[in-house]
Swiss-Prot record:
Residues 18-37 bind DNA. GO terms for molecular function: DNA binding; DNA-binding transcription factor activity. Keywords: Activator, Aromatic hydrocarbons catabolism, Cytoplasm, DNA-binding, Plasmid, Transcription, Transcription regulation. Involved in regulation of chlorinated catechol metabolism. Transcriptional activator of the clcABD chlorocatechol oxidative operon. One of its GO terms (biological process) is catabolic process. Signal peptide: none annotated. It comes from Pseudomonas putida. The keyword DNA-binding applies. One of its GO terms (cellular component) is cytoplasm. Its main location: cytoplasm. The gene is clcR. Belongs to the LysR transcriptional regulatory family. InterPro entries: ClcR_PBP2, LysR_subst-bd, Tscrpt_reg_HTH_LysR, WH-like_DNA-bd_sf, WH_DNA-bd_sf. This is HTH-type transcriptional regulator ClcR. Residues 1-58 form the HTH lysR-type domain.
C-alpha cells in the first residue's frame, strides 16, 4: 500500500467520478485506475462499484475511507512534526543544574526557549558538576548549568551571565553595612562559605575575590549548601556571601548587602558536548547570551 494510492482513493471517493478526481489531482485517469486496482488487489476487497454517474463506494470502501483519511492525517502530522524537530522547534531538552542557578537565571533562559519553540518540552534534574559531565558523556542529558566546571575533553564550557555577590546576614547586621560594602570593610568578619564539595567551587571563588582585594577572609565554616550557610548566619555564627539570585528572594529576618570591589561577580556557565548537539539544543544555544568571565 502506498500513500499515493490512499490519496487517489480518497479523491475518487469524494468526487464520485474518476475523471473529476483526475482533474482535482492534475493527472490523467489511467494512473488513478491502475492504482485503485492495485489497492483493491492488495486489500483483497472491491472498493468501488460503477454507476451511470461514475462510481460509488462499497461497504468495504466506506469503511476503508475512514481509515485512509486517518492514515493520511497522521502521516501529515508526522511530516510536520519531523520537519519541526529537524529545525529544533520541538523535542525534549534534558537539562541538569547545580546550585542556585535554578532560582532565577535558568528559568529566564528556558522561558526564552519556550517562547520560540512552544511545543518543546523541558526536563530538569539536579546533578553535581561531575555527574553532569558523566551524564553528558552517557547521553542522558543535553546541557548542564552551574559554576566552575573542571576541564573535560570534548565538553564545552560557556559563560552565559555574571552575577553580583552579596553579603548575607541577620537583617539588622546586614543593614548596618548600608546598601553596599567593600571587601576591605569585612576583614574581621567571620565567614560561612559554601559548598563543601565540588572544588573548585563558589567558596573558592569568594575567597579569590577577597584575596584580589588584598583581604584574607576569616573563614569559620565551609558548609554543604547555601541553606546551611544562611541558617548559621541567621543563628549569629557569622556572615555569608551569596550570588545575586539568592539575594533577589525575600527571606524573613535575613538581609543582603551588595559586595563591591575587586570584580565582585561570579559566572553562571553551561556545559554541553560539541559532538552531540540535537536540533532542540542548537535552538537553545542560539538563544543564550555570551558573556566574558570577569
Amino acid at each position: 500500500m502506498e500513500f499515493r494510492q490512499l490519496r487517489y482513493f480518497i479523491a475518487v471517493a469524494e468526487e464520485g467520478n474518476i475523471g473529476a478526481a483526475a482533474r482535482r489531482l492534475h493527472i490523467s485517469q489511467p494512473p488513478i485506475t491502475r492504482q485503485i486496482q492495485a489497492l483493491e488487489q492488495d486489500l483483497g476487497v472491491v472498493l468501488f462499484e460503477r454507476t451511470h454517474r461514475g462510481v460509488e463506494l462499497t461497504a468495504a470502501g466506506t469503511t476503508f475511507l475512514e481509515d485512509a483519511r486517518r492514515l493520511l492525517h497522521v502521516t501529515e502530522i508526522s511530516r510536520v512534526r519531523s520537519r519541526a524537530a529537524s529545525r529544533g522547534e520541538i523535542g525534549e531538552l534534558r537539562v541538569a543544574y547545580f546550585g542556585t542557578v535554578v532560582l532565577h537565571t535558568l528559568p529566564l533562559l528556558l522561558r526564552q526557549l519556550l517562547s520560540v519553540a512552544p511545543s518543546a518540552t523541558v526536563s530538569l534534574t539536579q546533578m553535581s558538576k561531575n555527574r553532569q559531565i558523566e551524564a553528558l558523556d552517557a547521553g542522558t542529558i543535553d546541557i548542564g548549568f552551574g559554576r566552575f566546571y573542571p576541564y573535560q575533553e570534548g565538553v564545552v564550557v560557556r559563560n552565559v551571565t555574571n552575577e553580583r555577590l552579596f553579603l548575607g546576614a541577620q537583617k539588622s547586621r546586614a543593614r548596618s553595612f548600608g546598601e553596599q560594602v567593600h571587601c576591605s570593610a569585612l576583614r574581621n568578619e567571620p565567614f560561612i562559605l559554601f559548598p563543601r564539595e565540588g572544588r573548585p567551587s563558589f567558596a573558592d571563588e569568594v575567597i579569590g575575590v577577597f584575596k584580589n582585594a588584598r583581604v584574607e577572609p576569616k573563614v569559620v565554616a565551609i558548609v554543604e549548601d547555601v541553606n546551611a550557610a544562611m541558617a548559621l548566619a541567621l543563628a549569629g555564627v557569622g556572615v555569608t556571601i551569596v550570588p545575586e539570585t539568592v539575594a533577589m528572594i525575600s527571606w524573613p529576618d535575613f538581609g543582603f548587602t551588595e559586595l563591591v570591589g575587586s570584580k565582585a561577580t561570579v559566572p553562571v556557565s553551561c556545559i554541553y558536548r560539541h559532538d552531540h548537539i540535537a536540533p532542540i539544543l542548537k535552538t537553545f544555544l542560539n538563544l543564550l547570551p555570551i558573556r566574558e568571565s570577569q
